[in-house]
């Protein structure tokens, strides 16, 4: 075979690989409720023979829309391999609440309504709860469960990795007082805005749930308590504990298991 022919084959293979790569783009999604544009990183497979299943990934405190790609650089490969659409919104340091203290911070409304509408309008998704999952790390773990528990008509599966699933033991941390006021003066708000107290709002079968946390994580105890309350309420869920602390290497590993869990849910629905 001539060198010219080999060169041609190489070029064809190269372009076939490129055309099958997932696309990564950052879009600005306008939030009517907050009257501003929100950056959102979207990882979409190049080809899909069926409507895309969507996984919403929420970042932690101090992060932004690029955080998940920084932790998991091969997210585009996973999107292409599994035919998944990953949506990573910028949640600022909001804890993904509609803040009762700051009317300009309405990230629950943004993620659960405005962003969903944008994604289902602009991408070939399955526009039903059976086609959507949501998860996140740390602050985003709390946010994902908070939103899913309160919008079971929108999401079919939800997860949390190292999530701050009970905020009350940490009243001085992560600017939560900007959203809720101080714990001392706003005990009822803190009680009603911690996701462990939202468990009573769901029933078994409303959501496919997966929760994980590392043994060395400062959120380990509250995750154990969260798991215990789910058991007490007879809510089926996967609960995974493994060696690890509150950092990127832990989440780089844990997200693989969550994606596998969501894939199984999508395949069954």
Where are these regions (language model features)?
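Positively charged n-region of N-terminal signal peptides that target proteins for export
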Residues: 1-7
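Short, intrinsically disordered, low-complexity terminal segments
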Residues: 2, 18-19
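Bacterial N-terminal signal peptides
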Residues: 7-16
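Non-catalytic cap/lid and distal C-terminal segments of serine-dependent acyl enzymes
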Residues: 21-269
